[in-house]
Amino acid sequence: IIVTDTGSTDRTKELASRYADKVLDFAWIDDFSAARNFCAQHASNNWILSLDCDEYVNSIDVKTMRILMQKFPRYTGVIRLKNLVLDEDGQTGYGTDDVTRFYNKNFYTFDYPIHEQVCSKDMAKREEMMQCFLLPMEVVHHGYALTPEEMQDKQRRNLSLLYKNLERNPDDSYTLFQIGQSEFILGNHEKAVTFYERGLAGDPSPEFIYVQVMIISLAKAYVKVGREKEALALMDRYAGRCRTAK
C-alpha cells in the first residue's frame, strides 16, 4: 500500500503510516494524473489499483482478481463505483459509475489533469477501445455527498483546471465534454450546449462511454434551453451508432 499526500494539513499522513508500506509527499501541481503516476512509480509490482482518499473498498475477491490478471495481462480493470450522494432534502442515496482504476503500469498510465483517465502508453493506441474486465470488488465513494453549495464550489474548482487544459488542447473532445458537464451542473445550460457541441464536432466514436454520455447530456441541455426539436434530431442522428440514443 502506497499513500501519496498532496499537501494535507490534518492527521492524514499519521494515520496512513499505520497501514501503508510507504507514505510519500507530492507537491500539488494542479494535476491529479501526475499525482497518481508518481504514486504508481513507487509500487514494487506492475499491477496498480488506484483509489482516492474519499473512497474505500467495501468488498473484494482477491482470488478472482489474480485469475483475471493472469488470463488478461494487457486488459484494464473496471471498478463499479458506488457514489454516495445527497438529494435536495439532504437524504442519502447512491448512484453508480464504472471507472477504470486497475492496470499494468508497463502498458498504461493516467492522463488528464482532472477527471483523469487510464490510457495506453502507446500514443498510437489512444483512439482504440481498451479491453477490460469488471473487478470483483465494491468501492464506495463519498466525494459527491455534498450540499448544493459544496457541489458548486467543487465544479468551479474543476472548471479552473479544465479550462487550463483546454488552452493546451483546444480540440480535445473529452475535455470539452467535462467542461460541458460542469457548466450544466452549475446551471449554465447555454455554455454546456456550446461545449458539448464542440466535443461532438470532431465525431468521436460513440463506442467510448463518455461520448454516449455527451450525446445524452447535449439532448438534455437542448431541452433546458428550449431547443427540443434539436434534441430529437440529435437522438435520431445517433440512434444507429449509440445504444443510449436509441
Each language-model region and where it sits:
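Catalytic-site signature of metal-activated, phosphate-bearing donor transferases
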Residues: A34-A40, V57-T194
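Conserved donor nucleotide-binding strand/loop of the catalytic core
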Residues: E14-F38, H42
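Flexible helix-coil transition and linker loops at the boundaries of alpha-helical arrays
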Residues: N165-N169, L200-V213, R241-K246
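A conserved acidic beta->alpha catalytic loop
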Residues: D5-E14, W28, D52-E55
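Short aromatic/hydrophobic "clamp" motif used to bind/position activated sugar donors
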Residues: I48
